[in-house]
Amino acid sequence: MNSLFASTARGLEELLKTELEGLGATDCQVVQGGVHFQGDTRLLYQSLMWSRLASRIMLPLGECRVYSDLDLYLGVQAIPWTEMFNPGATFAVHFSGLNDEIRNSQYGALKVKDAIVDSFTRKNLPRPNVDRESPDLRINVWLNKETAHISLDLSGEGLHLRGYRDGTGMAPIKENLAAAIVMRSGWVPGTPLLDPMCGSGTLLIEAAMLATDRAPGLHRGHWGFGGWAQHDDAIWKEVKAEAQTRARQGLAAYESRFYGSDVDARVIERARRNARRAGIGELIDFDVKDVAQLNNPLPKGPYGTVISNPPYGERLESEPALIALHSLLGRIMKSQFGGWNLSVFSASPELLSCLQLRADKQFKAKNGPLDCVQKNYHLAESEGGKPAMLAEDFANRLRKNLKKFEKWARQEGIECYRLYDADLPEYNVAIDRYADWVVVQEYAPPKTVDAHKARQRLFDIIAATIAVLDMAPNKLVLKTRERQKGKNQYQKMAEKGDFIEVQEYNARLWVNLTDYLDTGLFLDHRIARRMLGQMSKGKDFLNLFSYTGSASVHAGLGGARSTTTVDMSRTYLEWAERNLRLNGLTGRAHRLMQADVLGWLRESTEQFDLIFIDPPTFSNSKRMEDAFDVQRDHIRLMTDLKRLLRKGGTIMFSNNKRGFRMDHDGLAALGLKAQEISQKTLSQDFARNRQIHNCWLITAA
């Protein structure tokens, strides 16, 4: 009997134990990452040929204590290597694990290689050559603390490499994990199996091989026992011949079908090639189809199983499309696949909840470094018609707001407006529309809120928003924002450079929904900008802390004699120039100046009839001479502004500080007075948030 070890992906150990016992293995002991077992020579070869779950089959050769590199060398050399190698066999060493003495796996592998080679040269035998790519023997050494475990890897390459796959689509799963997913799915061979996002077909191919009794090792061309002196070629040929016979018989007897579809035609063609190479191509119907086009291929029965490993993104921007995809899949399952079973494997439990189905069973497994879950569902026969929507109370409020604001915005001639502003406290997001795009902004929840629940609620919001607005998921932009402090307000998020053109009254403006936390257009200032346009005819207009210059555009379109746009950011000034140019406002009459606004104010001697200033609440930018606090410093600001204001001129002063208190006495000392117009500048879509900004008209007293 041989003592053997089968490694596998984390989470599959018990399943592998059951499989090995079915092959005839004895004394199976589960450990993390694999199973120790006993078996004769035939069982050794059968485990290599037939295990669908094992990553590798190892023959342990010995172990040694390692307190120095010499201990490792001597421990390896104690193994009778000359009795293990066929003459002329090549080998490679795979070394994993580190300790205080062996701190580099390459160094460890080199010591093992030296010990093996020296075992031959000391007996005056030809030294074996190393072949890292395709060796006849693979030596595996695992250093765990002070103990090195030395094994012969009889698999050669990993057993997941069945020999049928020439390439993969994005984010593949290994074949042995795919086999485990099939085994755990609840699917019964002989019944239909459908994968609506099949990629290169791995799940369906593994299922078809299982159903037709086709050994997973049948198509492999290289093994790890070719140079092993104890290899019994006669028994190996018997095992292989038996597998070939069973595969022929299994294929001939199998009557059910498999169905696979994917939106990518190139991936589907690859799946067809893979299935043909695996010998079961005639059993699988592959089709180029989006999930939205999915239908039941057997509406009159029999019932089957839908199995899938849908995409799951790790980038925030991919989530809206993935949420919509899972929500859509759930609706289609309920409406078209009543009586079927569904099994979905994913690294995102939150996305699975968008299916709106209750799982009967669930399993955990690792896909490489990712913690994954597989959930099985039964779709009741009565489930049909229109399913309930996620976050129904939120969806109802959004519908109500849409009905109200859509008509109003059309009448006003605006394409950008707020649809939802944390109307329901438990759905704490803002939803803004920019033409046919939508931005969902979630404030980062407090630490007291469970992160998983907060993320789940956000997913519900996105799914409901896409459904209510009947919009393309790729036109929804998701942003999570913390309460902004100073310069963080304008932090860079990405480098896409995607601008879209929108209308605001008679102005055309560029917005960018992805590259920055803000979009280039503060929607709550819309009415203030229109007022500036109405006040600007024949006047010299100054726009300070100008951001992307939208106020300058309105002033220019309102007939201003000149506009001067000042901001410290070159990026935003270039954006402002694009906005002005889009509206035909070019030439010397429309100046753009990059400067520290506070420093520029102190030094400028120019005069203006109308000044708009919307300073940050607080700023301590390195490029500004002093830290700025709008509450503390607004009178100092007005002192400089008064010097630039022509007789009879007006300052529109706005800021976003909640609880801002105007220093009327300080203004009076300057000979100025302030009229608050905050409520006049608040449009319908911001009526719920009356403190979003405060706005003042300041003139001579």
UniProtKB/Swiss-Prot annotation:
It catalyses: guanosine(2445) in 23S rRNA + S-adenosyl-L-methionine = N(2)-methylguanosine(2445) in 23S rRNA + S-adenosyl-L-homocysteine + H(+); guanosine(2069) in 23S rRNA + S-adenosyl-L-methionine = N(2)-methylguanosine(2069) in 23S rRNA + S-adenosyl-L-homocysteine + H(+). Its EC number is 2.1.1.173, 2.1.1.264. Residues 43-154 form the THUMP domain. SMART domains: THUMP. One of its GO terms (molecular function) is 23S rRNA (guanine(2445)-N(2))-methyltransferase activity. CDD domains: AdoMet_MTases, THUMP_AdoMetMT. This is Ribosomal RNA large subunit methyltransferase K/L.
